[in-house]
Amino acid sequence: MSSYNVKEMMSKKERLAPGHRMCAGCGATIGVRAVLRALHEEDHAVIANATGCLEVSSFMYPYSAWEDSYIHNAFENAGATLSGVETAYQVLKKRGKLPKDENFKFIAFGGDGGTYDIGFQSLSGAMERSHDMVYVCYDNGAYMNTGIQRPSATPMFADTTTTPTGKESVGKMQNRKDLASI
């Protein structure tokens, strides 16, 4: 079994270019960079990114911080978008339209609102059909780039703009959705 070599990982080429508009120290940026570093140098990546903070901060047409192929899609369809791209890739490879030695990886990024709620149906379908893709949910417990509203990922008793805490409310009354179990 091989061990994780931090120096080796950190020396890999950056696939998320500097100059994006993410906040300094943002967890999404750190997570994206870690996921992309897991790729081999020779891998080609196709990234689908649901509308959200990561998308609006890393891709503002005509500027993009993404070094790999990048698709911006709506909140609800990162799973559907990437499953379609992955299927097209498999068909083209099978028909000999793509070189056999090229390796593509398919990665979707979505926030908790776009994953747990709005995009759950398309993600569920992609997983049920066993598409060869990785879906990364950036979970910060609320719809952060639209005013901190509560998705089903918000923990019980959390204070959001739609579940405020105070004299008349204790915050969100429901348990957080257990997405991994579903």
Regions found by a protein language model. Give the residues of each.
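Cofactor-binding active-site loop characterized by glycine-rich and histidine/acidic residues
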Residues: 2-135, 143-144, 148-159, 172-173
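ATP-dependent adenylation/pyrophosphate-handling site
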Residues: 139
